[in-house]
Each structure stands twice: as structure tokens, then as C-alpha cells.
From Swiss-Prot:
Protein name: Maturase K
Pfam families (UniProt xref): Intron_maturas2, MatK_N
InterPro entries: Domain_X (IPR024937), Maturase_MatK (IPR002866), Maturase_MatK_N (IPR024942)
Subcellular location field: Plastid, Chloroplast
Length: 510
């Protein structure tokens, strides 16, 4: 972000959140499409796959002149000959929407940079906290002492205007809001990315950056209010009773906010819900988890509070079936490709005292995580590595590659899956996945050389594709000391890597 801060006049545009003039700045397109500025994408002599800043300006003007703006993308037939290029509307409409997404992301990045620079002497570097695997050590530390959990499917806006209204609180530029409406209403199936993974619209495919920004901003808006409640309730619990005037003043400010939150008449009731007891909240994508040490009655209050909160403040209708109340000791959490649960492990210890012996039974709670094998095998089958029953098959589309490239591709997939699912308490599932990939690789190579798998493996020997099974030992040898008993043997416990920032494609079946 530093390399283009000098191009942007913060005092004029960004202080007032005026974004529309930046759409006509050529350097913005350069940063959005070519961060290294090695080549220019905006060329005046634009062809079918080239872009011209002048044409972009004309397109925006043409959009506003249309009585029915849906005519631009009404169909993708051969009749679409705007400016003499087939699908040119689609092309320029796409680039404007992507650059618009790049522009609205800049203020958040600048705020993050300024915040880190102002506190860099006080804040310890915590890049590992950005890893999605950091959630599971949190589970292991906190969930052993909790009773109930709410599994929440975050509702999505039923109308596009809700997203626009949310942005109005910080985007004061009316022209940008109008342009955003053009983008949103153009893609009528915009919410298929949330409601269905099978049918992905043009919007989610070609304008995923803009869509994800809008959806994340929508979720962040409601989470910011949620975190505000939690922080204030925590502050009240830690404040001594003697500071009565400060508490009265604080409650006065809370009552003032009743106008902002019209779904309740008594703000103290909301605060009580957060104080007794304090909940733990995590989220990834469209699913969140709220865990508490409270009773079943309290969790039901949480459930209907969230439903009313979404409906009254964000105009979102959420059915009660989208929030599940489960007891941690009897239920497994389905989260980020893992089944997580709290298990009770019993151990019997024999104690000898003089002539008497006693058997002491100890029960300890353990946070257990296992891999969701059926969806993972389904993902492998969808990628044509095996059939629906898990039997390995050859990857026919890779038979034209070199042998080394085929082995590297299979090995990369295997390493990524092993890396992501290394936190599993049971390793047998990973062995099965490795077996599928190993045999699929052998079948692919045998098909390429027009040989049988048995003859191919016999010719290469037992060392063929040994990296499929030795990758974890290689990683552990770098992490653990050489003289460690764990390093000398094969460690079967969970390992969470804090360098994973997203779910691998084959691991993402949600």
C-alpha cells in the first residue's frame, strides 16, 4: 500500500470517503491489475482483451444513459456487438467492477497500516494469529470448560439494497453508491455463492473480489456491534462496585443507544445476556460458533436474541433452524473440515498403601478432532482421483505431462492435505487419502506408458512415491529436537501449523 499512497490525496478524497473520482485515474487500474507495474494494461488501441481508459469512461456514461441498465448484460448472444466487439460489454463491465472493489479496499488497508505503525513499539508481531488453524488451539484451551454451543449459519441479505444501505454509513459518495447498484442488480443470482455451491453465478466467478468484500463488510458490521456488547459487559464485570457514578454514566450512554437498536426497550437486558456468562465466539466464512458455560435456557435466549437482532437491525430474516443448540459432551462440531468434540478419557491407577491396595479411576476431558472422510473422498472423486466409493482411478487429463510433473502434482496435493489435516487426532484417515492419491498417481503413469499398475510398481520398486508417506517425518524432524523421543519415533498426536490462511480446494467441501 505504501507505493501508491503518494498518488492519493487523502485530505481531499479519502477524508470524505469520495471514491468515484478515483475510478477515472489510470494508475488505479495499473495497481489493480499489475501491482509490479511491469506492463500497462490500459492501452488506447484496445482489442478484444485490452482495455482503454477512454472506453471505460464512455461505458460508465453509456450505463447511466440507458433507461434499462440490464440491457447491457441481458444476454450473451451474437447480437451483442457493442463498439464492434463481441462480449465487449461483459469485458469492460468486469474491469470496472473489479477496480471498484480494489478502490473500496484501500481505506481499510491504510487504516490497518497506520494502526500498526502507531503501535509497532507496543505490539508484538503476531502473523501466526492470522492462521485459520489458530482457532483449534483456542478450542482445546476453552471448550473443555464449556457446556453448550450454538452453531450459527449467518443469514445473507434477501435484498441487494441492504448491502448498499450498509455501505452508506461510511461511503458518502452518492455516485459510487449508484455505480455499486448497477453492479449488484446486474447479477441477479449474486447470492448463489452463499446459498448453493453447485450453481455459481457470473458475479461470483468474475467479480468474486467485489462480492467477498461486500459480504465480509456486511458480516463485520454486525460482528462489530456484537463485540461492542461483549467488551462493555466484560468492563462492567471488572469494575468495582464503588465506582457507582461511572457505571451510572455508562448506563446513560447505553440508554441513548436504544434509538439505534430499536429491537429492545431495555438495553440492560441485552447487557445482562452478555454478562451471565461470558460467551466465546469464532467464525469462518458464513458459519459461526457461540459457546458458553451457561444452561440450556440461556442458550435458547441467545438463539432468539440473535434472530431478533438480525431481523430488526439488519432487516434479515433468519429461520430458527439456522441456529442449532448442542451440548458439547454429546455433539461433534462440524467446522472447517473437522469433526471436533469433547471426549471423556478414563484411566485407572492402582495405589498400594501398606497391605491395602486401591483402584483410582480418573476421568479427563480431551478435545478430539477427526477428519470428515466422506466429504473429502467426495472431493477427490469430483476431481477424478477416485470414484464415489473411494477406489483410485487414473487422472486421464494429466497423461500428456512429463512423469516428473505428474508426480510433483500428486505430491503437492498430498502434502497440502497432510499439512492441513495434521491436527487430526486419528491419522488413519490421512493414510487412506494418501493411499488413494498414491495409487491414482501410479494408475495415471501406467496409463501413460500403456502398462499395468502391477508391472509399473514392480519395475520402479518399493521406493516409488515414498514422499507420500514420509512428509510428516520430514516436517517433524525440522520442528522437534533430534534427540527427542518423539522425533525418533512417529508422532501420532495433533499438530497445528500456524501458516495456513485458507482451506485447500480439495479440503473445502462446504
Amino acid at each position: 500500500m505504501k507505493e501508491f499512497q503518494r498518488y492519493i490525496e487523502l485530505d481531499r478524497s479519502w477524508q470524505h470517503n469520495f471514491f468515484y473520482p478515483l475510478i477515472f485515474q489510470e494508475y488505479i487500474y495499473g495497481f489493480a491489475y499489475d501491482p509490479d507495474l511491469k506492463k500497462s494494461i490500459l492501452l488506447e488501441n484496445a482489442g478484444d482483451k485490452k482495455y482503454s481508459l477512454l472506453i471505460v469512461k464512455r461505458l460508465i456514461t453509456r450505463m447511466y444513459q440507458q433507461q434499462n441498465h440490464l440491457i447491457l448484460f441481458a444476454n450473451h448472444s451474437n447480437q451483442n456487438d457493442f463498439w464492434g466487439h463481441k462480449h465487449t460489454n461483459n469485458l469492460y463491465y468486469q474491469i470496472i467492477s473489479e477496480v471498484f472493489a480494489f478502490i473500496v479496499e484501500i481505506p481499510f488497508s491504510l487504516l490497518l497500516i497506520s494502526s500498526l505503525e502507531s503501535k509497532k513499539r507496543k505490539i508484538v508481531k503476531s502473523h501466526n494469529l492470522r492462521s485459520i488453524h489458530s482457532i483449534f488451539p483456542f478450542f482445546e484451551d476453552k471448550f473443555l470448560h464449556l457446556n453448550y454451543v450454538l452453531e450459527i449459519l449467518i443469514p445473507y441479505p434477501i435484498h441487494l439494497e441492504i448491502l448498499v444501505q450498509t455501505l452508506r454509513y461510511w461511503m458518502k459518495d452518492a455516485s459510487s453508491l449508484h455505480l455499486l447498484r448497477f453492479f449488484l442488480y446486474e447479477y441477479r443470482n449474486w447470492n448463489s455463492l452463499i446459498t448453493s455451491q453447485k450453481s455459481i453465478s457470473i458475479f461470483s466467478k468474475r467479480n468474486k473480489r467485489l462480492f467477498l468484500f461486500l459480504y465480509n463488510f456486511h458480516v463485520c458490521e454486525y460482528e462489530s456491534i456484537f463485540v461492542f456488547f461483549c467488551n462493555q459487559s466484560s468492563h462492567l464485570r471488572s469494575t468495582s462496585f464503588g465506582v457507582l457514578l461511572e457505571r451510572i454514566y455508562f448506563y446513560g450512554k447505553l440508554e441513548y443507544l436504544v434509538k439505534v437498536f430499536p429491537f429492545t426497550k431495555d438495553f440492560r437486558l441485552i447487557l445482562w445476556l452478555f454478562k451471565e456468562p461470558f460467551p466465546h465466539y469464532v467464525r469462518y466464512r458464513g458459519k459461526s460458533i457461540l459457546a458458553s458455560k451457561g444452561t440450556s435456557l440461556l442458550m435458547h435466549k441467545w438463539k432468539y436474541y440473535l434472530i431478533n437482532f438480525w431481523q430488526c437491525y439488519f432487516s434479515l430474516w433468519s429461520q430458527p433452524t439456522r441456529i442449532y443448540i448442542n451440548q458439547l459432551s454429546k455433539h461433534s462440531l462440524d467446522f472447517m473440515g473437522f469433526f471436533s468434540s469433547v471426549q471423556l478419557n478414563s484411566s485407572v491407577v492402582r495405589s498400594q498403601m501398606v497391605e491395602n491396595s486401591f483402584l483410582i479411576e480418573n476421568t479427563m476431558k480431551k478435545f478430539d478432532t477427526i477428519v470428515r472422510i466422506i466429504p473429502l473422498v467426495g472431493s477427490l472423486a469430483k476431481a477424478n482421483f477416485c470414484n464415489v466409493l473411494g477406489h483410485p482411478i487414473s487422472k486421464s487429463v494429466w497423461t500428456d505431462l512429463l512423469d516428473s510433473d505428474i508426480i510433483d502434482r500428486f505430491g503437492c496435493i498430498c502434502r497440502n492435505l497432510s499439512h492441513y489435516y495434521s491436527g487430526s487426532s486419528r491419522k488413519k484417515t490421512l493414510y487412506r487419502i494418501k493411499y488413494i492419491l498414491r495409487l491414482s498417481c501410479a494408475r495415471t503413469l501406467a496409463r501413460k506408458h500403456k502398462s499395468t499398475v502391477r508391472a509399473f510398481l514392480k519395475r520402479l520398486g518399493s521406493e516409488f512415491l515414498e514422499e507420500f508417506f514420509t512428509e510428516e517425518e520430514k516436517v517433524l524432524s525440522l520442528i522437534l529436537p533430534r534427540d527427542s523421543s518423539i522425533a525418533r519415533g512417529f508422532y501420532r498426536g495433533p499438530i497445528w501449523y500456524l501458516d495456513i490462511i485458507c482451506i485447500h480446494d480439495l479440503a473445502n467441501d462446504e
